A protein has these predicted regions:
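Accessory RNA-recognition modules of RNA-modification enzymes
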Residues: 1-153, 158-234, 241-242, 247, ...
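Short glycine-rich anion-binding loops that position phosphate/pyrophosphate groups of nucleotides
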Residues: 237-239, 264
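C-terminal substrate-binding/active-site "lid" region of AdoMet-derived donor-dependent transferases
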Residues: 247-251, 255-301
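Flexible, glycine-/basic-rich loop-and-beta segments that form/coincide
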Residues: 305-306
Length: 306
């Protein structure tokens, strides 16, 4: 992108000396400003400021260890009413590389969740598995409900408000990377969401579900507030969720599953497992988030008959 090239030029990256086989990574979130002139290099560098990271062999050489990202989400699917969510992401951690990917994926996933929920808003519970820094978690908690005044929900640009007549969805998020969970908790707190609404757990997804949900005391907070999801969103790594997690989702009683996948082979295997567990595919959409490569991002909606 122009932002990456502008920062690379400003750092004189092309004329630096590096050791042989050095791993060099330059991460530069692009400014999210409507009508911004990316051809104005001085204005671009000013807008970027210190929001970039040059990492060489996993060591921060220049910029910031914590990067700021911004995602706009359509309120109740209405693109004329947009909400903005801000995220802190570790420069060494994972974030979608395509600049438009987070926004497209969040809006599409939220649309599927709303569809799966139908008219139900009361006591809605959602799971966000392999949740990273909270890309889906925060919008799910504030915008998943199809009733009530979601436009006044907490989280837009750090402001707070009320959820109108509808209780916000309760979201259980689970992520294995400690630094991603740390960022997620920071982002959740900045959005003004309490732990009664969103609980972010750290650990292997299968093991955490087993210990915190299925084998935990019925009196535990996790079991009381989060154990029975209406919809499960999962965005596993390339290896996929695998059979144990698929079976745990089915055991939870979730009536719908939104599966975000970066590897079609793993997705096909896991969809086969879900089908054996009584789920059927309702929709499948592919996103070309890796132009000029053979990679593709896929989002599948599956539902289970009552």
């Amino acid at each position: 992108s122009r932002a990456v090239l502008a920062v690379a030029d400003s750092l004189d990256l092309w004329n630096r000396s590096f050791s042989p086989n050095a791993q060099i990574r330059l991460a530069v979130p692009e400014p999210r400003v409507d009508g911004f002139d990316f051809n104005d290099k001085a204005a671009l560098l000013s807008a970027i400021g210190e929001n970039y990271a040059l990492i060489v062999n996993d060591e921060l050489v220049a910029g910031s260890a914590l990067l700021s990202e911004r995602v706009r989400v359509a309120v109740d699917g209405d693109s004329s009413r947009m909400r903005t969510f801000d995220y802190d992401v570790d420069a060494r951690g994972f974030w979608q590389i395509h600049r438009a990917a987070p926004e497209h994926l969040v809006n599409y996933v939220l649309g599927l969740v709303r569809s799966a929920l139908g008219g139900r808003t009361k006591n809605t519970v959602l799971w966000d598995l392999y949740s990273g820094s909270g890309l889906f978690t925060i919008p799910l908690a504030t915008l998943a409900n199809v009733g009530g005044d979601s436009s006044s929900a907490v989280g837009a640009l750090g402001t707070t408000g009320t959820f109108g007549s509808a209780e916000p969805a309760r979201v259980l998020s689970i992520e294995g990377a400690p630094i991603a969970v740390k960022n997620a908790r920071r982002n959740i707190g900045r959005a003004g969401l309490s732990r009664d609404i969103v609980e972010a757990l750290e650990g292997d997804v299968a093991q955490t579900l087993e210990s915190q949900v299925f084998k935990a005391s019925k009196s535990s907070k996790i079991v009381r507030r989060f154990a029975h999801p209406d919809v499960v969103v999962l965005d596993p790594p390339r290896a996929g969720a695998k059979a144990q997690v698929c079976k745990q989702i089915a055991k939870s009683g979730a009536r719908a599953v939104v599966y975000v996948a970066c590897d079609p082979t793993s997705l096909a295997r896991d969809v086969g497992t879900f089908r054996e567990l009584g789920y059927s595919v309702q929709s499948l959409r592919a996103f070309d988030l890796y132009p000029e490569t053979h990679h593709v991002e896929s989002v599948v909606l599956m539902s289970k008959a009552d």
